[in-house]
């Protein structure tokens, strides 16, 4: 099965160049090339440098720390990447993973960090053979249509070689005299993918010629179905925030469909937030759909949170996107939200003087005011001039002295009274003045800052929460 729009039987060089052109046609961002040192990824490195060098932001290579091969492969990538004049980012695992899943998680965490740093997308060297193997592996574990799309599923990851075979890439490298290393673990029958590659697929192909192409066709049909689901989400008022770590839909979209449809939509919505729902999580999400209590939430696999919340009508109308011609739906503001645990881990900390609070800290903005506001609430605070200030995420055990609790009260109680959803709290900013909690924006203000004697001048700020 050739790549989309590319005829069969063309020379290898023309095939590779055309595959890159097709894959990059709809991609605006620069690319971080994921290169391991094997034949597929080294072909990606050399081909991209030859035919699309201006699209390369960096070359990323990850040493899993599993032995001499991993180090040699990373060194090969780094040497040739730099020889070609490309930026190379190399990292070694702090501790070797214990299985394929751990290696994959560590590698993807690294690639995503590098891509964010360059405001780029990741490009991998997955081939047509990888797609066939992945479809078979998904069948073996009982995946539904969503999982059977495998590597062809809609994704921010760019995969130029998905219509190219591993053999074609190796043959091109040999004809050009280009180097690569063969990973000895690819031949090990210890790993499921290797057993599928070397034993199961050849046996099935021998018993039923065309089996491999049939698997590819299943994957393509499933991918087409997934693209239709994704288009439906976009048209139904999807909002993606926090650098892709949070996604939401109007509650009516899910409430007005069948439980079977809800299962499909919850899985797709979760994926937009970087969350993979397992069967248990999908069932829990479907049950949660009938929840009518705003602020209710559940946690699912990986520590991700699903919640029901309300947002201001003007914010929803803006986020849904007037540029797409989508009107905010009836009952505006009530939304189901999926938020990955990673969204909380991206909260950042700042320290400095009270006169120079950061204009922006993550999704929070601090705006300095020229004078004390005529009317103010917990979103406003006056900080004494010349004091040391720290802005950091809330921590379990934080306490604040207030007019109603001069001895101090746990911030978590104020969160509860202000109806701040539990999943939101780990990202919520806390402002400390001289090491004492003085302000939790939008929630409460303390006595710590203004009540100290000899501090007449106050620097006034308003904190605003932004939505990406």
From Swiss-Prot:
Q: Which InterPro entries match?
A: Lysidine-tRNA-synth_C (IPR012796), Rossmann-like_a/b/a_fold (IPR014729), TilS/TtcA_N (IPR011063), tRNA_Ile_lys_synt (IPR012094), tRNA_Ile_lys_synt_N (IPR012795)
In short, the EC number is: 6.3.4.19
- Which positions in this protein are listed as binding ATP? 36-41
Q: Which reaction does it catalyse?
A: cytidine(34) in tRNA(Ile2) + L-lysine + ATP = lysidine(34) in tRNA(Ile2) + AMP + diphosphate + H(+)
Judged by the first EC level, this protein's enzyme class is ligase
Q: Which Gene3D superfamilies match?
A: HUPs
Q: Which GO terms describe its biological process?
A: tRNA modification
Where does the record place it? Answer: Cytoplasm
Q: Name one GO cellular component term.
A: cytoplasm
A GO molecular function held by the record: ATP binding
Protein keywords: ATP-binding, Cytoplasm, Ligase, Nucleotide-binding, tRNA processing
Q: What is known of its domains?
A: The N-terminal region contains the highly conserved SGGXDS motif, predicted to be a P-loop motif involved in ATP binding.
HAMAP family documented for this protein:
tRNA_Ile_lys_synt (MF_01161)
NCBIfam families from the UniProt entry: lysidine_TilS_C, lysidine_TilS_N
* Function field: Ligates lysine onto the cytidine present at position 34 of the AUA codon-specific tRNA(Ile) that contains the anticodon CAU, in an ATP-dependent manner. Cytidine is converted to lysidine, thus changing the amino acid specificity of the tRNA from methionine to isoleucine.
Q: Which family does it belong to?
A: Belongs to the tRNA(Ile)-lysidine synthase family.
Protein's recorded name: tRNA(Ile)-lysidine synthase
What organism does the UniProt record list as the source? Answer: Gemmatimonas aurantiaca (strain DSM 14586 / JCM 11422 / NBRC 100505 / T-27)
**Which gene codes for it?**
tilS
